[in-house]
Amino acid sequence: MAPHALPAAPGNGAGPAEVEAFAPALDESDLAVQVSEHLDDVATGISLAEAKVVVSGGRGVGSADGFGILEELAGLLDAAVGCSRVVTSAGWRPHTDQVGQTGTKVSPDLYIACGISGATQHIAGCKGAKKILAINSDAEAPILASADYAVIGDLTEIVPAITAELRKGREP
């Protein structure tokens, strides 16, 4: 069962669960996997799985550098940045940012899909969102069928315009 695949069950009123320390006595012969290298935690920012808002990009972003405008918008919205499988396959973003059937399944209040065509596998990962805003230059993109709101146009113009309006709203 994938995390966030189903809504959380209501509590039974018994209060928080008790945490019990457990340290099994194992040696290397008990382990099916051996750790050959420890990598520093590369995850930064807000967790995709826990985010209330996710700003996600697809092939339409154009390049790794194209994610800069999405990161700027995400910063203003206290959002996580996600992406489609095509983006991780191209090496533009790490796999930890991938939303979809083979990535993270998300259920934010708002999912902003920028330049994402909307493959079935991607929709499987974001269909738990309460609202989906799709920004796409293709008026026939499959993601539009799943979107609550859509803006058809160039995301390199639309995303900065949204960011500018949000900044104006925060000025004293």
Where would I find each of the regions flagged by the language model?
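N-terminal glycine-rich FAD/FM-binding segment characteristic of electron-transfer flavoproteins
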Residues: M1-P172
